[in-house]
From Swiss-Prot:
Compartments reported by the entry: Cell membrane
Glycosylation sites: 22, 36, 139, 211, 235-236
Domain of life: Eukaryota
Gene: MSP2
Protein name: Merozoite surface protein 2
Lipid-anchored residues (GPI-anchor amidated asparagine): 236
CC annotations in GO: plasma membrane; side of membrane
Keywords: Cell membrane, Disulfide bond, Glycoprotein, GPI-anchor, Lipoprotein, Malaria, Membrane, Merozoite, Signal
Amino acid sequence: MKVIKTLSIINFFIFVTFNIKNESKYSNTFINNAYNMSIRRSMAESKPPTGTGGSGSAGSGAGASAGNGANPGADAERSPSTPATPATPATTTTTTTTNDAEASTSTSSENPNHKNAETNPKGKGEVQKPNQANKETQNNSNVQQDSQTKSNVPPTQDADTKSPTAQPEQAENSAPTAEQTESPELQSAPENKGTGQHGHMHGSRNNHPQNTSDSQKECTDGNKENCGAATSLLNNSSNIASINKFVVLISATLVLSFAIFI
């Protein structure tokens, strides 16, 4: 009898300790799995969407800063008070300046004749006539100056004077091309409508909302670890319940055995 009592007591303590160990073990695994799942979900939600937004903003900011920092002088020169002049007026101004310079040279070359005429003595009423050699040299210089003025006149003036008339013609020629470009778009409009409807129908078929739970989404996404964690949690809870029932039954039998044999 004493041997049975001692054995029953030993068995009781063994099962109690085993139950405590199992409960602590499974509870720890349950807590760890739940904690890991919460961490994974928080990491999945906190992941930023990978796209071209960040790179585009970085590139545009770098380009703007590089442009403003590399050429501050060019930005300062582009003020509204000094508008940029077109190319054709610049050519006309250069031609006028050359003509004015040549005209001034011609007048300055002719002035010595007048000075020679004015340098006559006032007491005498006669005017000294210039020599024939002076006349010939003056005529030759005038002819050379006229030839220089003719040779220095660029042909751009004629092109500039004709260019305003050519621009309306080009505008008129561009108008039919615009009409031609509009007409194919109008012709291709029904085809685009048909293809758009077709694509819309396929999109409506494929884009129906699917009623799936979070666990199914995680399993379909390929997160096998999450699926395994969820199933392991369920298995652990069921194992804990079964072990608790088994320990309760054994403890009850031991209590009854003590009561009977004592």
